[in-house]
Every structure is written in C-alpha cells, then in structure tokens.
Design a protein with these regions (language model features):
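Alpha-helical membrane-protein topology signature
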Residues: 1-205
C-alpha cells in the first residue's frame, strides 16, 4: 500500500470533521474559522495524493486548497470585525482573490495533461462561483455554490483525473466532498421548519 496514499486518507478524515461542522454554522466569522482549518488539512491531502499518484494531476487542487486556506482566514478576520471599513476591505480582497484565482486557474489548466484540461476548467469556474458565494450575505449562497463546487471536485478524484500511479480513485477526496453536500442537506433539514427565521432569509447581494 502506497504510504502517501494512506497519509492522504488520514488527512481526509480530519478534513471531513471540520468541513461537515462548518456548514452547520450560521455565523459567518465562525464558519470561516472552522472551514479555514479544514482547508489546511484538505491542502495536505492533495499534496499527499500528488506524491502517490502524480503531482501534475493534483497541482490545480493544491493551488485551490492553499488559496482557500488563506482566503478563509482573511475573511474570518473581516467578518469578525463586521464594520463598514472591514466590509469595504472584504470587497477589495474578494476582487483580488478573483483575479488571483483566474491567473492561478489558467496556469494550472495549461500545465495539466491535455486529457483532463476540460475538467480543471470546470473546476476553476465552480471555484470562482464558490468564492463569490462565500462573500455574499446570508447562509444560502455559500451552500448552493459549495454544492456545485463539491460535485466538480468529486470528478477530479476519479479515474477521469488520476492518470498515474496504482490508485485510480481517491476515496477520501470523494468522501470529503460528499460530506460537504451531506452537511448542506442536514442544515436545511434542521431548519426546514424555520424558514422565516431572520438568519435564514435569502439576503440580497
């Protein structure tokens, strides 16, 4: 059994705990703190998968996870303050992050094997949608966009993307994304009887 593959699975289990928990949280600053910790372990999992199955097919995912960790930590600080100044800073930071994501995403797509570029292109589009969804007010945008993003990432952890090595499926990578989707479902089941609760209103951007 490939040691790096096993390490990736262990890091994935840790990631699941943080990611599932984060989508049960309605407070934005607390959400960003918990999900930033999860993103750090998520990044580690992709690095380990890169050593196990080929770094070039995991590079865009490592970039995305690193970017996610930094972004979530900054947004955590911004939403914790929740002042007009911090909101303006947050909007400027969001625009910078979108620019960085575009550049990094295009570079990763260009460097990816030709067979999987279409998949990484979809991943970049889904990731950008998620970044915007995270920043938008309320609890719904982030959950809708993370579901789309998770579905695309699941595809990157299958033989569609893992071209080299002995392992054709990253089961833990798939489990993490399924945990996010499951957490969103559980969240809405929990609050299904409270649609008029202020924090559950569909906020205007």
């Amino acid at each position: 059994m490939n040691t790096w593959f096993m390490i990736a699975q262990i890091l994935g289990i840790i990631t699941i705990a943080f990611e599932f928990t984060s989508y049960q949280i309605t407070n934005k600053s607390k959400y960003f703190l918990v999900t930033s910790i999860g993103s750090f372990f998520w990044m580690g999992m992709f690095v380990a998968m890169g050593f196990a199955t080929g770094m070039d097919t995991q590079l865009s995912l490592i970039v995305a996870a690193t970017y996610s960790t930094v972004r979530n930590l900054v947004f955590w600080k911004i939403f914790a303050k929740n002042t007009p100044q911090s909101k303006e800073l947050g909007l400027n930071f969001l625009l910078v992050m979108i620019g960085v994501a575009l550049v990094a995403g295009v570079l990763s797509i260009v460097n990816a094997p030709a067979e999987v570029r279409w998949l990484h292109t979809l991943g970049m589009i889904a990731a950008l949608s998620f970044v915007i969804g995270q920043y938008l007010p309320g609890v719904h945008y982030v959950r809708l966009t993370v579901t789309l993003y998770a579905l695309i990432v699941i595809l990157t952890q299958t033989p569609l993307n893992i071209l080299y090595g002995d392992f054709r499926w990253n089961i833990m990578g798939i489990a993490i994304e399924l945990a996010k989707i499951s957490s969103v479902v559980v969240f809405y089941l929990r609050f299904a009887n409270q649609p008029k609760k202020a924090q559950l209103q569909f906020a205007r951007p």
